[in-house]
C-alpha cells in the first residue's frame, strides 16, 4: 500500500501542525484546577457587542439558508466605515483564511516571501505549502522591529512582503515614519500584505495603520483585519481584507471558497461594527490591564517586549513549554512560543481583571 505522504505534494509535509493550545475542557480533564484563566489565544474578555443577543434570538432562519456568498451588506458596511469602495473588500473565514487565499493566488514554487520573525506561524506555513521560500527578518535584541533589516530584505524584490503590525506574537510595531521607509523600498513587483489583526488596540498611540500611507501608493497591497479580537467574534470566524486594486480583489474572489463567511458571522460582524461604544470599552480595558500586567511582570524581573496588542511577550528564562505546564497546573492557559531562538518566551493574553489577577497569583506560585 502506498504511504499517505506519497499521495500529497512534498510541500504539504513541511509545515508543523498548527499549535492552537489546550482547550478549557482539556485543561479541566488533565489538571482539574479550581478555576481557569484562558490567556493563550488573545481573545476578548468582554465578548462581543450586547446587541448580538437580539440577533441570536432571530437566528433560526440564518441557519436554514445559505448566506450571501458575496457578503454584500457587510462589505458595504466595512467599506463605509474605513472609507473604501465595496469592490475593494473581501471577506474570509477569519483573516487567516485570506492568508491562504492570497498565498494560493499569488505564490509560485521558487518565489520568496519576506516576513518578520518570530511570526504568526501561518504567515510562513501558507508560503511553504505553495513552494515559496521564506526570508525571516528577526526582531532586534530589545524585541522591536528591525526596520533597516526589513528594508534590506525587500530590496531583493520578493514576491510578497507579509508582516503583522502590531506584530504577533511580540506586540511591537512600526512607527509611521519607519513604515513609510519600508514601503518606499518595496518594488512594484512585490505584493504588500499587512496583517492588522490587533490594530484596534494600537490606535491612539504612536502606532499608525498602514492604510493612509498605502492609499497614496501605486504598489499592489492588501491590509487584513479581523473580527476575532477587539470585536469579540473569534468563535464565528470572520475577517476581511482591504485590497488596493479592485481588479486584484476580483481575482482573489475566484480563489476564495464560496460561502466562506457564514450567515451568522456576517450578521454578527454587522452588529459588532455598528457598536462603537462597546469597542471603545473593550480597547480601554485592554490598554489599562496591559499596562498593569506589564508593570507587574517587569517588577518580577521578566524582560517584556513593548506591546500594542492585547497580549504581552516575555522571557520566562527557562523552557517556555515547561513554564506553561506549571501555569496550567494552576489553571492558567498561556502560549509558550516554540519557534527557534524564542523557546524561552511566553505570550500571555490580556484578560479580564480577575483573569489577570489569577495569572499573576499563579506566576507568583511558580517563582
From Swiss-Prot:
Pathway annotation from the record: Amino-acid biosynthesis; L-histidine biosynthesis; L-histidine from 5-phospho-alpha-D-ribose 1-diphosphate: step 7/9
Domain of life the protein comes from: Bacteria
Gene Ontology molecular function: histidinol-phosphate transaminase activity; pyridoxal phosphate binding
Keyword match Amino-acid biosynthesis: yes
A single GO BP: L-histidine biosynthetic process
Xref: Pfam families: Aminotran_1_2
Entry EC no(s): 2.6.1.9
Catalytic reaction list: L-histidinol phosphate + 2-oxoglutarate = 3-(imidazol-4-yl)-2-oxopropyl phosphate + L-glutamate
Keywords from the UniProt entry: Amino-acid biosynthesis, Aminotransferase, Histidine biosynthesis, Pyridoxal phosphate, Transferase
Modified residues (N6-(pyridoxal phosphate)lysine): 229
Cofactor(s) required, per the database record: pyridoxal 5'-phosphate
SUPFAM superfamilies, A to Z: PLP-dependent transferases (SSF53383)
Record keyword Chaperone present: no
Gene3D superfamilies: Aspartate Aminotransferase, domain 1 (3.90.1150.10), Type I PLP-dependent aspartate aminotransferase-like (Major domain) (3.40.640.10)
PANTHER family, alphabetized: HISTIDINOL-PHOSPHATE AMINOTRANSFERASE, HISTIDINOL-PHOSPHATE AMINOTRANSFERASE 2
Family label: Belongs to the class-II pyridoxal-phosphate-dependent aminotransferase family. Histidinol-phosphate aminotransferase subfamily.
NCBIfam families noted in UniProt: hisC, PRK05166.1
Matching HAMAP family: HisC_aminotrans_2
Subunit (UniProt): Homodimer.
Protein name as annotated: Histidinol-phosphate aminotransferase 1
Record organism: Mesorhizobium japonicum (strain LMG 29417 / CECT 9101 / MAFF 303099) (Mesorhizobium loti (strain MAFF 303099))
